[in-house]
Amino acid sequence: MKRRTAREKALQALFQIDVSDIAPNDAIEHALDGEKTDAFFEQLVYGVIEHQVQLDEMISGHLVNWKLDRIANVDRAILRLAVYEMVYSDDIPANVSLNEAIELAKRFGDDKAAKFVNGVLSNIKTDIES
């Protein structure tokens, strides 16, 4: 599975977990839709779940005039996924995670999602790199 596909499927699983409160294994199975699983995909899903509190704190600290629970569910899932990659995946450059998140926002979010995701993640990236 290509990494972009793994990210898309991880986003779908994380979104389902967030809005439906279903078990991660069920969300993963549904997102895979019969496809073979992938280590990167599972790392993303389980990593975000494991570190969600820290990820949410980091994201919340970079929101201007927003609260995390008021952000669109898909945007919140994209931010969690990208911040997880930026913080916990040493083999992925932060710019790649940021760009992939913007592409996910363009594909799955509304018209303003990509700009919003870019702004939040750019600030987080700056903090991580400093």
UniProtKB/Swiss-Prot annotation:
The keyword Coiled coil does not apply. Keywords: RNA-binding, Transcription, Transcription antitermination, Transcription regulation. One of its GO terms (molecular function) is RNA binding. It comes from the Bacteria. GO terms for biological process: DNA-templated transcription termination; transcription antitermination. It holds the Pfam family NusB. GO terms for cellular component: cytosol. Belongs to the NusB family. Involved in transcription antitermination. Required for transcription of ribosomal RNA (rRNA) genes. Binds specifically to the boxA antiterminator sequence of the ribosomal RNA (rrn) operons. This is Transcription antitermination protein NusB. It comes from Bacillus velezensis (strain DSM 23117 / BGSC 10A6 / LMG 26770 / FZB42) (Bacillus amyloliquefaciens subsp. plantarum). The lineage of its organism: Bacteria, Bacillati, Bacillota, Bacilli, Bacillales.
